[in-house]
Amino acid sequence: MSEMTPREIVSELDKHIIGQDNAKRSVAIALRNRWRRMQLNEELRHEVTPKNILMIGPTGVGKTEIARRLAKLANAPFIKVEATKFTEVGYVGKEVDSIIRDLTDAAVKMVRVQAIEKNRYRAEELAEERILDVLIPPAKNNWGQTEQQQEPSAARQAFRKKLREGQLDDKEIEIDLAAAPMGVEIMAPPGMEEMTSQLQSMFQNLGGQKQKARKLKIKDAMKLLIEEEAAKLVNPEELKQDAIDAVEQHGIVFIDEIDKICKRGESSGPDVSREGVQRDLLPLVEGCTVSTKHGMVKTDHILFIASGAFQIAKPSDLIPELQGRLPIRVELQALTTSDFERILTEPNASITVQYKALMATEGVNIEFTESGIKRIAEAAWQVNESTENIGARRLHTVLERLMEEISYDASDLSGQSITIDADYVSKHLDALVADEDLSRFIL
């Protein structure tokens, strides 16, 4: 679990997301409160429930990007889902309980990686011994059993030194490795993924653990043996319990496009993928117990962050019970021309940096001038205003169009430098930006 302070979290998010300070502060406080809660005594800790967040803002302003970056910072079980993928219980489609099942699967994977990393040093020692046993087979007694030697032989120590120095990396050896489990593909109808995974694991267990002799270079064998030995040192039952604890205490669920499951106007007939989904989400957000293949998971202390553009629907169109369970509202602002300029230059891996790096692979040096950046930002903002406002995503469309000619001819331009200034941008984009009909189809 992350121990970063809210200021540190916001500072980290600032490296990738421009503006939206209110949203960054809210998620930073929510993340820090997870850590604060774990410092309380057990009785009080059980009473402190997370304050779920609803992020409201037009498309392309950074809602989903905040979720993506938060997943890396959280160091906790995290899952991002689209609200539109779910249907009401009893209808064809995914049920909302699968959110918690997927979150638990992600937690098991995360905890397994951490456990393997924790045992890595011991696993390396065991893998080294197995390779040395192949290079210098241990002595056997009259009954064909391996004798336990008090001290390793001089030859074994010499080979160990060579192995550690990488002198034997390219030498081929034949070694017994765990065979891959029997793969069984099962095609199941939507909504029955849980049964499918249980059947697959059952068929895999039928085969048992078999060994298979493989001929490999020592450096490749070492990697596989370390993984195999580390997996043996991990207790599967303990791992499952740790994963469930991690989900229950630190789990974070990000639900995107929640505005798409709002009921719009008066409609007759069942609304199975809108209001029905909201009703099914209620117990999860409020706190219930969900059955997963790893065990029962309580959702009382899982943090839910929902987001939506709410361009047609309004937050008040959500059913009242769900509104009450999303107490923190954060409004994200529409992006301006100056925001677009900052997006093109400030983030660690901004779009302009990506294009420069891609063209550098062909030996072409691209330089974006300040006037060029400003003109690109103005063009993107202008197209957003005259057609549909898709926020920062418009920059990708505009830049792709601008760089199309260079990308096509890059292999013939090796060794050249190209400067993208205001004149270059105007020459390639002005006609398209000015013609609204062309903008709708091309930009």
Curated annotation (Swiss-Prot):
One of its GO terms (molecular function) is ATP binding. GO terms for cellular component: HslUV protease complex. Induction: By heat shock. Keywords: ATP-binding, Chaperone, Cytoplasm, Nucleotide-binding, Stress response. GO terms for biological process: protein unfolding; proteolysis involved in protein catabolic process. Disulfide bonds: none annotated. ATP binds at I18, G60, V61, G62, K63, T64, E65, D256, E321, R393. It comes from the Bacteria. It holds the Pfam family AAA. It is found in: Cytoplasm. Its main location: cytoplasm. InterPro entries: AAA+_ATPase (IPR003593), ATP-dep_Clp_protease_ClpX (IPR050052), ATPase_AAA_core (IPR003959), Clp_ATPase_C (IPR019489), HslU (IPR004491), P-loop_NTPase (IPR027417). The keyword Mitochondrion does not apply. A double ring-shaped homohexamer of HslV is capped on each side by a ring-shaped HslU homohexamer. The assembly of the HslU/HslV complex is dependent on binding of ATP. ATPase subunit of a proteasome-like degradation complex; this subunit has chaperone activity. The binding of ATP and its subsequent hydrolysis by HslU are essential for unfolding of protein substrates subsequently hydrolyzed by HslV. HslU recognizes the N-terminal part of its protein substrates and unfolds these before they are guided to HslV for hydrolysis. Belongs to the ClpX chaperone family. HslU subfamily. This is ATP-dependent protease ATPase subunit HslU. It comes from Escherichia fergusonii (strain ATCC 35469 / DSM 13698 / CCUG 18766 / IAM 14443 / JCM 21226 / LMG 7866 / NBRC 102419 / NCTC 12128 / CDC 0568-73).
